[in-house]
Curated annotation (Swiss-Prot):
PROSITE patterns: V_SNARE, WD_REPEATS_1, WD_REPEATS_2, WD_REPEATS_REGION
PANTHER family: LETHAL 2 GIANT LARVAE PROTEIN, SYNTAXIN-BINDING PROTEIN 5-LIKE
The name this protein goes by in its record: Syntaxin-binding protein 5-like
Modification after translation, per record: Phosphorylated, leading to STXBP5L increased turnover and subsequent de-repression of insulin secretion. Phosphorylated on serine residues in response to glucose or phorbol esters. Ubiquitinated by the E3 ligase SYVN1, leading to STXBP5L proteasomal degradation.
Protein species of origin: Mus musculus (Mouse)
GO CC, one annotated term: plasma membrane
Membrane topology listed for this record: Peripheral membrane protein
Compositional bias annotation for Low complexity: 16-26, 578-592
Pfam families: Lgl_C, LLGL, WD40
SUPFAM superfamilies named among the record's database cross-references: SNARE fusion complex, WD40 repeat-like
Gene name per UniProt: Stxbp5l
Length: 1185
């Protein structure tokens, strides 16, 4: 029977009645609840587009997690399967194998993982968590599941040990007791080793928690128990008594056996190692302080830092390895965390970049009574995982195939590109491989377990991450993997900061002045653009050849002209009478002269960073073509950039901030437009004026309130952006409420590129304020506050109270009058979205032309027309004319994204220039012609044609028809929340709008009708890291930074959810357990006990009895038989109820059938009698009746 899907019914109802929504668009629901209704389409002929997407195409599920496990706590290794497991403080477990085998699983409780133990070659894993619960994980499936859990109620777990090929797990507790758990049934045995029986009766003090458990390699019936206070007990399991006891003055941290079972080594809190012989337990056989200073004979060695762990591994043909962490001398406080390797008389200290959490020695054999033959050491650091090769004398490290260095510098932004040009990955890899670090071990990565294949998903994917130190990393994300391709350092463009220069020249940000804020990449043309936190934009071009050249830089002065706002000139002048006068002579081939003014002198017209003035050698790859910097204005640093876009076809880059918009021609290296946001509207007003050119170096009076007035209220205003990226660049993942995080800095905050700095407030007073006037305003009086709160939900800020008369509706009257008082009353609008496209700039346009869509934080959309030279030759010499078209569109909330569709409903891609190597000496630039790809049909230029423009803000989405500028569809996405990220993506060859809301909802809407396809409460927003890094891409995929060190990928495609099992790797592969070595006749006779030890007979219920029920509680896991029985029972119950309902329905149908049969019999009888009556009176005349 075909499955009935109620969502199809809803899709059909929505499609059949698109105008059923409220025309007012009012909605009281939260995110994901909204109304879809057509706009004003009366009398407008509209082509109905057949949409192919339905709700069956969408489903949300997580796919894979990349990066280093955040806050690691435990490490385990299976020497036969060769897989590695890492536990974290948040209850997560990452299981790693060969490249492509990377699995993430999570404890539901979220408790920290204390210890991990593999059931070697059994496809299972035991985890002990901080809530005193043991879990058994099944690894014989691609998504590991918990089979059993055992919750200890009265004791806290401190240590676990599972002997090789044993089904009995030893569990040590904080009280000093040792319990035994059956792995198969996960039931506690009645056999318990109490601490008071393990120590001598004469001892009155508690030995402390159990810190070590291990069975003797020589005799499985003997258990070594280590207590924290320095006591070691050798327990005979059969006789249930202590065979010997060892006492030491210093606390014990770890113990390890010699493979022969005659000696064991302990590490202590005073930095010493003690070697004990079972034949003479009264005192240590050997005591050493590896890093202590040598003392005179008879004196105790100098105490050192604790040795937290030691491993004692033997080799057949060489001296044993003694490997330990810690133990350095106290007088070397500046020394970094270290791992010491002692091999014979040689001592090697490996210094680490981060504190050591755990380490394990990887050995050839799983049997503890054989020569271990160690070949590598896996070292788990707080922020890294390294593996040291022990087979080479210099102990090199293996090259890590996993992307464990995503957080090498904190991630500040991300971008995700699916279905890229296929040659890009090979090109980037071939360039990046030349710059890889050298000195790695020449052997293969030792963690090589599991199995993985490419699966059905073969299209190329690239992830780009921007970092706090200015680096940009390109990653190959194809086929559910992540591998480094290429690394770009943007800081090489600038001069290095001197010791005393940083505070003076870079007051915009206190730390990380090169932090990457936004990235824009065109894969087809290979043009790459990046904006930094210090208000700069760098344009990179890709080249296969090395070049040495000077870096071209432009300095742009972007400010608010108060005089123009307050006193409009009465005469009317054309907005752009002479474009050549608009091109400022700010092209600087020698770099910027960033000279710091002496103390007390107002800074003006200097950038935050200094571009290198000397010729710079640029290796193959991305090479800087142009640097654009915003400069200080009258002592005020430039505002951070909030939006960025570039067009390789037009040769134009545009960016904006809270002050205004800048448009630059990067072919001719000239500034085309530098205009405040308010001037974009004024260009269509009655009082039209020529906008200020950046080259006009006007000196404003010191009492200019527009740019400096608020500094009187906040003296520390110059420190305003120091906390902008603090929460993103610090690796402390302390949860911060969204409202507090967004308002952390009272002077600047950026959510999704929306700047909310109060320094960008415009002045609405009718006169220029003097210093005395400003001091009066400081008192606030009964008049209006000096600045207001922006109404956009994504632009929260700490500001003064908002008065009623200052509240502005998010609607905009298209027929604007010459008065701009309503705009003057508002805070300045930030440029939040930019988009280049061939479109209709005005209502009366009959053909498409190059346009720039500009979206603001107050929901306004301004179309700017770009008039380009007609030929390629003129493009390098003739100026580009940039004219605001006078077309305005409006939405609720800050504008987030744009996109266009042609009249057939196909998504239109912005035009681009085909890539060519700018440094190719074989081509003559003068004879070479630019190859442009225009992604629209020739029929779209015909008279009367139109296109659909999709605009999404943080509150709603609208679809406009151009050039008529009629709103066809409106969808009010949310009223109580706001959208953080929105993008128009391609799914199954159809376009749809994907949105991520602040309250965790992911919503998908079809285009152009904006019908809801999916609304899932996926992820509650707990910190701004997710908001800043969440991004959608084509083919139903998305990603975000789930922790400071990890990237989480997810899919909203039903097809990918169905095929996810085929894309993941197998953790378990059938491998025969290696056979134990033959010990020989003499070793078997004299080397130790040769008798077998039956743990089942000793620990089973028959001999040991049952454990107390109150001690531990057994919890069946979802993957266990009990869990499956429960689920099956639930299914059977549902089937039973369905069968009963079916029987009742069948009974009613039977009764109805009987009634129907009776009615049919009556009808036949009536028909028969009627026929007989007709025959009786057929031949009679009327007068015979």
């Amino acid at each position: 029977m075909k499955k009935f899907n109620f969502r199809k019914v809803l899709d059909g109802l929505t499609a059949s009645s698109p105008g059923s929504g409220s025309s007012s668009g009012s909605n009281s629901g939260g995110a994901g609840s909204g109304s879809v209704h057509p706009g004003g389409t009366a009398g407008l002929p509209r082509e109905e587009i057949q949409e192919s997407l339905t709700s069956d195409y969408f489903q949300i599920c997580k796919t894979v997690r990349h990066g280093f496990p955040y806050q690691p706590t435990a490490l385990a290794f299976d020497p036969v399967q060769k897989i590695l497991a890492i536990g974290t403080r948040t209850g997560a477990i990452r299981i790693l194998g060969r490249p492509g085998v990377d699995c993430y699983c999570q404890h539901e409780s979220g408790a920290a993982v204390l210890q991990l133990q593999f059931l070697i070659n059994e496809g299972a894993l035991v985890s002990a968590s901080s809530d005193d619960t043991l879990h058994l994980w099944n690894l014989r499936q691609k998504r590991p599941a918990i089979l059993h859990s055992l919750k200890f109620n009265r004791e806290r777990i401190t240590y676990c040990h599972l002997p090789f090929q044993s089904k009995w797990l030893y569990v040590g507790t904080e009280r000093g007791n040792t319990h035994i758990v059956n792995i198969e049934s996960f039931i506690l045995s009645g056999y318990v080793i109490m601490w008071n029986k393990a120590i001598e009766l004469s001892t009155k003090t508690h030995p402390g928690p159990v810190v070590h458990l291990s069975d003797s390699p020589r005799d499985e019936g003997k258990l070594l128990i280590g207590y924290e206070n320095g006591t070691v007990v050798f327990w005979d399991l059969k006789s249930k008594r202590a065979e010997l006891r060892v006492y030491y003055d210093e606390a014990i941290h770890s113990i390890d056996w010699h493979h022969e079972g005659k000696q064991f080594m302990c590490s202590h809190s005073d930095g010493s190692l003690t070697l004990w012989n079972l034949k003479s337990p009264s005192r240590p056989f050997q005591t050493t302080v590896p890093h202590g200073k040598s003392q005179r004979e008879g004196r105790k060695s100098e105490s050192c830092k604790p040795i937290l762990k030691v491993e004692y591994k033997t080799c057949r043909n060489s001296e044993p390895f003694i490997i330990f962490s810690g133990g350095l001398s106290y007088d070397k406080a500046c020394r970094r965390p270290s791992l010491t390797i002692m091999h014979g008389k040689a001592i090697t200290v490996l210094e680490m970049d981060h504190p050591i959490v755990e380490f394990l020695t990887l050995c050839e054999t799983p049997y503890p009574n054989e020569f271990q033959e160690p070949y590598a050491v896996a070292v788990l650091l707080e922020k890294d995982l390294i593996v040291v090769d022990l087979t080479q004398t210099n102990f090199p490290i293996f090259e890590n195939p996993y992307p464990m260095d995503i957080h090498e510098s904190p991630v500040t932004c991300t971008a995700y590109f699916a279905d890229c040009p296929p040659d890009l990955i090979l090109v980037l890899y071939s360039i990046g491989v030349k710059h890889k670090k050298q000195g790695y071990s020449n052997k293969e990565w030792p963690v090589s377990g599991g199995a993985w294949n490419l699966g059905a998903q073969t299209y190329p994917e690239i992830i780009i991450t921007g970092h706090a130190d200015g680096t940009i990393k390109f990653w190959d994300a194809s086929a559910m993997t992540l591998q480094m391709l290429y690394k770009l350092k943007t800081s090489k463009v600038f001069e290095k900061q001197k010791a005393g220069e940083g505070k003076q020249t870079c007051e915009l940000v206190e730390e990380d002045p090169f932090a990457v804020q936004m990235i824009y990449w065109c894969p087809e043309s290979r043009i790459f653009c990046v904006s930094g936190v210090s208000a700069y934009v760098i344009i990179y071009k890709f080249s296969r050849h090395e070049v040495t050249t000077e870096i071209v830089s432009l300095e742009v002065r972007l400010q608010c002209d108060v005089e123009d706002i307050i006193t409009p000139e009465p005469e009317t002048s054309p907005p752009f009478p002479d474009l050549s006068s608009q091109l400022p002579p700010s092209r600087s081939l020698s770099g910027s002269t960033n000279t710091v003014s002496s103390e007390g002198v107002t800074k003006d017209s200097i950038p935050c960073l200094s571009v290198k003035t000397r010729p710079v050698r640029m290796p193959p790859g991305y090479q800087a073509d142009l640097v654009i910097q915003l400069v200080w204005v009258d002592g005020e640093p430039p505002q951070q950039i909030t939006s960025l876009s570039i067009s390789s076809a037009y040769g134009i880059v545009a960016f904006g901030n809270c002050t205004g918009l800048v448009v630059v021609d990067f072919i001719q290296k000239t500034v085309l437009l530098s205009m405040g946001t308010i001037d974009l509207y004024r260009s269509s007003d009655l009082y039209q004026r020529q906008p200020r050119s950046p080259r006009k170096n006007r000196q404003f009076i010191a009492d200019n309130f527009c740019m400096r007035g608020l500094s009187n209220f906040y003296p520390d205003l110059t420190k305003r952006i120091r906390t902008s990226y603090q929460s993103l660049t610090e690796l402390n993942d302390s949860p911060v409420p969204l409202e507090l995080e967004r308002c952390k800095s009272p002077t600047s905050d950026h959510v999704n590129g929306h700047c909310t700095s109060p320094t960008s407030q415009s002045c609405s007073s009718g006169k220029r304020l003097s210093s005395a006037d400003v001091s009066k305003v400081n008192r606030w009086g009964p008049g209006r506050p000096p600045f207001r709160k922006a109404q956009s939900a994504a632009c929260m800020e700490i500001s003064l109270p908002v008065t009623t008369e200052e509240t502005r509706e998010n609607s905009y009257n298209r027929s604007r009058s010459s008065s701009i008082s309503s705009i003057d009353k508002d805070s300045k609008e930030a440029i939040t979205a930019l988009y280049f496209m061939e479109s209709f700039a005005r209502k009366n346009d009959s053909t498409v032309s190059p346009c720039l869509f500009v979206g603001t934080s107050l929901g306004m959309v301004v179309l700017i027309s770009l008039n380009l030279p007609s030929s390629d030759e003129q493009r390098f010499t003739e100026p580009v004319v940039v004219l605001p078209s006078g077309t305005f569109l409006s939405l609720k909330g800050a504008v987030l994204t744009f996109s266009c569709m042609d009249r057939t409903g196909s998504l239109m891609q912005p035009p681009y220039e085909v890539w060519r190597d700018p440094n190719n000496t074989d081509e003559n630039e003068k004879t070479w012609k630019r190859k442009l790809v225009m992604n629209y049909s020739s029929s779209s230029q015909e008279m009367g044609d139109h296109q659909y423009t999709i605009i999404c803000s943080e509150k709603q989405a609208k679809v406009f028809s151009l050039p008529s500028q009629t709103c066809l569809y409106v969808h009010n996405i949310t009223e109580t929340s706001f959208i953080l990220q929105a993008d128009v993506v391609v799914m199954c060859n159809s376009a749809c709008l994907a949105c991520f809301c602040a309250n965790g909802h992911i919503m998908i809407m079809s285009l152009p009708s904006l019908r809801p396809m999916l609304d899932v409460n996926y992820l509650p927003l707990t910190d701004m890291r997710i908001a800043r890094t969440f991004c959608f891409t084509n083919e139903g995929q998305a990603l975000y930074l789930v922790s400071p060190t990890e990237i989480q990928r997810l899919t909203y495609s039903q097809e990918m959810c169905d095929n996810i099992q085929d894309m993941l790797g197998d953790l378990f592969t059938p491998i025969e357990t290696p056979e134990a070595q033959n010990r020989g006749f003499l070793k078997g006779l004299f080397g130790g006990s040769g008798q077998t030890f039956d743990r089942e007979e000793l620990f089973g219920e028959a001999s040991a009895g049952k454990a107390s029920r109150s001690l531990a509680q057994h919890i069946p896991g979802p993957g266990s038989i009990e869990g499956m029985k429960g689920a099956a029972g639930g299914v059977m119950g549902e089937l039973t109820r369905a069968r009963i309902a079916l029987d009742e329905r069948g009974q009613r149908l039977g009764e109805l059938e009987e009634k129907t049969a009776g009615m049919m019999t009556s009808a036949e009888a009536f028909s028969k009698h009627a026929h007989e009556l007709m025959l009786k009176y057929k031949d009679k005349k009327w007068y015979q009746f």
